[in-house]
């Protein structure tokens, strides 16, 4: 049995920590199910900042030095100051330098500072893992790391827990629903989705799950486009309510402009939903155009609107894409990916 330490400065609040905390928790549980021990070191704060993450990483150095472990796995920039002498793995879920390019203002500044630390982290680590070939290429380019040093292990989903929640979620009658789930940053392309949605049949509704700095601007845009009565900003939802949104959706859409992986696509496929997304970054590695999803080019509002309308009007196509997605998502099941992760870090 191996003993691993996971280090993450990401908030345990899904509303603040995005999908990262969920993915780390699911990975921990799946590795424990294989017979190993996993300890997570994380801050107690409900919300993290660049400053708090740096202080957290400085604060845990002594604890890491004195705690027995076969490997220290630091996620993203966290673990940057881990002591040498034991296997140190940098597990990069978001290439922060890449994300920073798509943001603005203080968010961009914060990501740029964090990216400098993430670069230092991957160069100090014994092994580097990321979730997609796209992200591996970005790490190699932005952080000047040999691409051959980077292993790829995809994100994962607990299909058993998801299926139980789906089965318990009540089915609701009503108009067609387009669902998107995202932290509301510029790079998620929700403004593009709103403009495309303005062209689809008026009986459809758009339901947006997530919070973020773009929320008020997006609300204003929905009013400007004259669709505010059909657009529902739901904020952050707890797990059971989130699954219920997937269960009652007609299709899932996220025209993102940058994505290192996209756990929400796994959630949509696990819910047998057809997907409309963009042909960009890691998205084509997760979904397959014409098989599990219909893809547009990023920023192409006209094509996006056509794809949304096509799926809204074609139940047979929705069924075909949804069924294919459900079959495809099995490759990302937690036990499967946990074994890949352990093999990648070289610990048995």
Feature roles, as predicted:
Residues 274-277, 287:
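Short hydrophobic beta-strand element within catalytic cores of glycosyltransferases
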Residues 22-26, 176, 180-199, 213-219, ...:
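A conserved mid-protein helix/loop that constitutes part of the nucleotide-sugar donor-binding site
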Residues 134, 156:
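Carbohydrate-associated surface elements
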Residues 109-128, 137:
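Membrane-proximal helix-turn-helix segments that form the acceptor-binding/catalytic region
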């Amino acid at each position: 049995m191996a003993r691993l330490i996971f280090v993450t400065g990401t908030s345990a609040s899904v509303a603040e920590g995005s999908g990262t905390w969920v993915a780390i928790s699911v990975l921990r549980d799946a590795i424990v199910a294989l017979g190993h021990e996993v300890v997570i070191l994380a801050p107690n704060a409900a919300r993290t900042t660049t400053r708090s993450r740096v202080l957290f990483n400085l604060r845990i150095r002594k604890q890491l030095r004195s705690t027995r472990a076969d490997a220290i796995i630091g996620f993203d920039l966290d673990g940057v100051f881990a002591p040498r002498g034991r296997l140190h793995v940098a597990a990069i879920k978001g290439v922060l330098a890449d994300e920073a390019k798509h943001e603005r203002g203080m968010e961009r500044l914060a990501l740029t500072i964090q990216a400098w630390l993430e670069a230092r982290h991957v160069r100090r680590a014994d092994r580097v893992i990321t979730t997609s070939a796209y992200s591996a290429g970005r790490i190699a380019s932005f952080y000047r790391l040999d691409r051959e040093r980077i292993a790829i292990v995809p994100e994962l989903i607990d299909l058993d827990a998801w299926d139980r929640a789906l089965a318990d979620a009540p089915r609701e009658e009503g108009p067609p629903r387009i669902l998107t789930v995202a932290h509301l940053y510029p790079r998620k392309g929700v403004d593009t989705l709103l403009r495309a949605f303005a062209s689809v049949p008026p009986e459809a509704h758009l339901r947006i799950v997530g919070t973020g700095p773009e929320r008020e601007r997006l609300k204003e845009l929905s009013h400007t486009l004259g669709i505010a009565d059909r657009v529902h900003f739901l904020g952050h939802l707890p797990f059971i309510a989130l699954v219920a949104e997937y269960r009652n959706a007609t299709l899932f859409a996220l025209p993102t402009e940058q994505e290192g992986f996209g756990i929400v696509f796994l959630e949509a496929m696990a819910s047998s939903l057809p997907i409309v997304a963009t042909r960009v970054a890691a998205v084509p590695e997760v979904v397959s155009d014409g098989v599990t999803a219909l893809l547009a080019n990023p920023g192409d509002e006209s094509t996006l609107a056509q794809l949304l309308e096509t799926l809204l009007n074609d139940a047979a196509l929705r069924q075909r894409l949804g069924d294919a997605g459900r079959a495809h998502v099995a490759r990302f099941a937690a036990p499967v990916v946990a074994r890949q992760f352990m093999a990648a870090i070289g610990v048995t």
